[in-house]
């Protein structure tokens, strides 16, 4: 079941639906058109007694919490979130699988790329400064930033950061935040912002700077995007559907990582030299093997 963002190309919903369909020919996708649809759509799903109901994104955390308690003999999966009760508290349920990700891993990889671009002064990267815009504080967002900072510093220890947090999802407002960071020297803007990503990335494009996306491949938004830190929603959903088909559904937290092929960085743009890509791939192999463990906690001073 999608959130209200619909099945637009490149969206979280579209990627998740593709993963489900790749794992089972009998998948039915139900689109939600507004947040007010969530609870009713989940109840209608329950009436059909499906083997598994997958809800996409944290937007449905409370609706899943309510519905799963009413239908404890049915199985649910909540993508990229944990059920949240009516008091706003995360809650584990015995019939809900929380499909989560190690955001610090893709954050680290794109951080390495950004750090090397600054170190080598590739193209417009001349100020040794990276910009970050986050929607707000939270475990996933903090992990993205922590990994990004660690990755960049692993190859460019003296690189500087400009970090801004915004509760606003207005693209125009986030564009202004990007303009401010660029005015302060930021060459590459890394967004973990949600719906206002397009505005922040536009700021990079207008200034002939660079941008890095998150969650899905955001190259479609602008030529300024040089890569994206990707959570492979399709892979996580496909593995969960396969697990149900094999009769081995497991409730609770499932954290997907590089070892599951559920983390990636998108194909870099032509601005990124091959030697930098090769170094990022080496870091990726080191994370997969356990030689490198990217941190999930933002360091002091960031």
Model-derived features with residue positions:
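A residue-level marker of the well-folded mature domains of exported/periplasmic proteins
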Residues: 1-302
